[in-house]
Amino acid sequence: MLQKLDFDNIPNFKNITETFVNPEYDPQNEYSVPYTWGTVGIIYDTTMIDIPPEEIDWDILWNEDYSDRILMFDNPRDAFAIAEIRLGYSLNTESSEELEKCADLLKEQKTVIQAYVMDEVFDKMGAGEALVAPYYAGDAVTLMDEYEDLGFVTPKSGTNLFVDALCIPAGAKQKEAAEMYINFMCEPDIAYATTSYIGYSTPNSAAFDMLDEETQNDKVSYPDSEYLNNNTTIFRNLSDEANQKMQDLWTDIKSTQDESQNKWIVPLFLVACVTLSIVIIIRRHIIRKKDVF
């Protein structure tokens, strides 16, 4: 799927901080160069959520106090990851039993969430339609720059650490040109411009040194190394069987009506029937009166 990189054409790889060299997903750094990185956390309305930031954890996404003001990821891997953390499972579990228990927990959540979202989180959190949502740190930075009442936390119980990397597909014909482009993206000023524009964290140590002190110390973009080492996990590619199991469970979760919706179906149907009956009776009465005259 990917071509091995010729690092003679990528001398700026020297700028990549040691933390992101030889990552778990590419142990020998043969196929990829990190571009940006970040964590998954919780965006929340600081004016409406009365829980101290240090106490906010994933269970808030099941909190009935914020019912119908909670958003949830609209993709299975991120949604299941949150359930996996809550249940004490690995973020890379392939156990059918554990995935099924995660699905049960996600079904329970349906009674309190407003919607499953991805990019819609920007509009809903920005407009105050929702109070809390899981999302990516880089996008949280963008949101908080625009809406000062929003905050972001990375839960103590753990989270996903993700890395966006530059790679070259196996079928690419201009491999050397692609490597030169990767090298260009690793130039300190280019990496600095990238992180400044999109809000995601940079793995480029030279670019990091160019950031202002406030950004360097911002725990949203750059959590403590102790937290990163002890409380984060990088996703691994799951087996085809585990992926299919998760997808099937997710489809079931999304298609299952929650109890709060079900309980209104019969009453609403009866009201509609009664209303329709009354309308029919009134119309017949009016028609009969017209016939008399």
Positions of the model-derived regions?
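Sec-exported extracytoplasmic/periplasmic mature domains
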Residues: 1, 63-67, 84-88, 107, ...
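Extracytoplasmic ligand-binding site segments that recognize negatively charged/polar headgroups
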Residues: 1-129
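Short beta-strand->loop
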Residues: 2-15, 32, 148-160, 169-172
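Short, hydrophobic alpha-helical packing/hinge segments within bilobed ligand-binding/sensory domains
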Residues: 57-58, 121-124, 140, 178, ...
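Periplasmic-binding protein-like
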Residues: 99-108, 146-170, 216
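A ligand-binding cleft/hinge motif common to bilobed small-molecule-binding domains
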Residues: 132-149
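Mature extracytoplasmic/periplasmic domains
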Residues: 169-230
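Conserved C-terminal helix/tail region of periplasmic/extracytoplasmic solute-binding proteins
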Residues: 226-293
